[in-house]
């Protein structure tokens, strides 16, 4: 059963009416209701608040990494383990083909259903997950394969065991190594881009965000609790943090925004998957045509956080 957010109640009501019209076999009513539905969707989704966009980024029906991998990656083979400690199910790694282009795909997977969510640790990777991702990146470099990374995590796992096994070192190592990979790298934030847990697989030649995704240094609730000592100030925190694709594109922190289907990726995962596939192929062609893409990647990364201080 589809899940509707509070601001989608009118959409739910019209959708229910359409289903009743189908049961009655009333094609005329169905056609009228579908036009009304399209109008309502455009009205709601063209006036979303930043808080509502956060809700969409976390929507339980939103496609996860495995959904996209199943839809766009052919002849795929999953690779497990980090060769050091364990296999982290929160990060998935595949070799396969996207439109006959051999690729390596690395994704953060939250899981569906109680058992699978627990297996995936709710998409919060441990150090072995990031080392597993780095192992696959080095594999891609060895065999000259482009890399597609799908980012979707609330953050790296903050447990004691993760810290004891070097969580911060694993993330820092990925930042260093991914910055110097000699193959094209493309990263797409498909849902939540939470802090260093997201950044560990977001250092790339092209960094894009889905239209209703977020990218932040801390959760808005955490920010509200720390700065305002009040978790209910989440909406205030969201505006201050500027975590939406539009804000981050204006700040020069991401390269592109991938538009979603009119009702959001959670209502049409097939169209959403196709747009990611087309973006990847277009971005890959652009990178491959640039003989200086490694230098350009380095310059882009070095420019982040730079500022000019004037003396009065």
From Swiss-Prot:
InterPro entries: Acetyl_CoA_COase_a_su, ClpP/crotonase-like_dom_sf, COA_CT_C. It comes from the Bacteria. Its EC number is 2.1.3.15. Pathway: Lipid metabolism; malonyl-CoA biosynthesis; malonyl-CoA from acetyl-CoA: step 1/1. Keywords: ATP-binding, Cytoplasm, Fatty acid biosynthesis, Fatty acid metabolism, Lipid biosynthesis, Lipid metabolism, Nucleotide-binding, Transferase. It catalyses: N(6)-carboxybiotinyl-L-lysyl-[protein] + acetyl-CoA = N(6)-biotinyl-L-lysyl-[protein] + malonyl-CoA. GO terms for cellular component: acetyl-CoA carboxylase complex. GO terms for molecular function: acetyl-CoA carboxylase activity; ATP binding; carboxyl- or carbamoyltransferase activity. Pfam families: ACCA. HAMAP family: AcetylCoA_CT_alpha. Belongs to the AccA family. Component of the acetyl coenzyme A carboxylase (ACC) complex. First, biotin carboxylase catalyzes the carboxylation of biotin on its carrier protein (BCCP) and then the CO(2) group is transferred by the carboxyltransferase to acetyl-CoA to form malonyl-CoA. This is Acetyl-coenzyme A carboxylase carboxyl transferase subunit alpha. It comes from Helicobacter pylori (strain ATCC 700392 / 26695) (Campylobacter pylori). The gene is accA.
